[in-house]
Amino acid sequence: MKKKVGIVFGGKSAEHEVSLQSAKNIVDAIDSDKYDVYLLGIDKQGNWHVNDRSHYLINEEDPKLISLNKTNEGIAVIPGAEKNQIVTSNSTKSLDQLDVIFPIVHGTLGEDGSLQGMLRMANIPFVGSSVLGSAISMDKDIAKRLLKDAGLKVAKGYAYRSVDKESIHFDSLKEELGLPMFIKPANQGSSVGVHKVENEEQFYSAIKDAFQFDHKLLVEEAIVGREIECAVLGNEKPAASVPGEILPTGDFYSYEAKYIDETGAVLQIPAKLEEPVVDSIQDIALQAFKALNCEGLARVDVFLTDDNEIVINEINTLPGFTKISMYPKLWEESGVSYRELIENLIELAIERNQRDQQLKSSRSDG
């Protein structure tokens, strides 16, 4: 019998369009002989739409113009139910019982534990990290504190909240971190709101922009090194892919280079590295995955310095699945096809849910 898979995509996030592209690639690649697909799109206002596979995206081939087809059919979620947890809000009829949800909502509310918490309350298995792993990985400040505590190297930097913005001074940070510096929102992905600054004017402009995306930001030293990414797959016994290298054609790997401009970067897969360095990167990726309580999947981004020091940049618990995204490409190079990768992720989600169901929820045995 086919499994029923709900794909949740879009979202009230600066990474909305990236999510639409990721969803399209997953829908195109999923094995229709094994899975029935249900499409649940979230628009930029946060409204949910039950979509049909034949027409769920508008301008789907253009990453600049791609958008969600808004339907008149929303949904409501019933927490605590054992079945029929999702009903259509207009007709109050339940959707077919979903076996698993594949959330591919990048960024705010989709990758930060919010969506994961709702799905846990509804007792629906879902792909990717649960609430804790998602939340702490999304917050770059908290993630780096935990990674550092686990003995892993991260860039030197400082976190500031918007209420403290008057205490952010260029001269003192320049003396502490040097130039250039990077300024980034603490809770954004895909390089949204990230700035490389070389002078005071750029610095304060970047601070202002970053605070438009989050109430907390990081000011970090620039690490001189190669940009390497490693994909991780699994639950309690995760595996790491071959590493790949990002070769940006611009100043750094920006949002445009990642998702809009196909010439914005060259992806070298596998990265040209000595075997001991590959082993070290894979080991550090797995350590980071475990330190942040990740499950299912993650992409670990690191810098490799000239003296082969590995510095973790960030960990992404719902990496992009667009046609130019590194995560699926790394697994393809490692011998796992795009279709097999989707199947593995679905099975990992179901496996974790079954494991969680074995836990006691009360002190009585009954």
UniProtKB/Swiss-Prot annotation:
Superkingdom of origin organism: Bacteria
GO BP field: cell wall organization; peptidoglycan biosynthetic process; regulation of cell shape
Keyword Calcium among record annotations: no
Localization: Cytoplasm
Binding, Mg(2+) 2: 314, 316
Reaction equations catalysed: 2 D-alanine + ATP = D-alanyl-D-alanine + ADP + phosphate + H(+)
GO molecular function: ATP binding; D-alanine-D-alanine ligase activity; metal ion binding
PROSITE patterns for this protein: ATP_GRASP, DALA_DALA_LIGASE_1, DALA_DALA_LIGASE_2
Pathway(s): Cell wall biogenesis; peptidoglycan biosynthesis
Main location: cytoplasm
Positions that bind Mg(2+) 1: 301, 314
Signal peptide range: none
EC numbers, comma separated: 6.3.2.4
Cofactor(s) it depends on: Mg(2+); Mn(2+)
ATP-grasp domain: residues covered: 144-347
Keywords, comma-separated and alphabetical: ATP-binding, Cell shape, Cell wall biogenesis/degradation, Cytoplasm, Ligase, Magnesium, Manganese, Metal-binding, Nucleotide-binding, Peptidoglycan synthesis
Cofactor note: Binds 2 magnesium or manganese ions per subunit.
A GO cellular-component term linked to this record: cytosol
Residue numbers binding ATP: 174-229
PANTHER family: D-ALANINE--D-ALANINE LIGASE, D-ALANINE--D-ALANINE LIGASE A
Protein family according to the UniProt entry: Belongs to the D-alanine--D-alanine ligase family.
Annotated function: Cell wall formation.
The protein's name in its UniProt record: D-alanine--D-alanine ligase
Gene that this polypeptide is encoded by: ddl
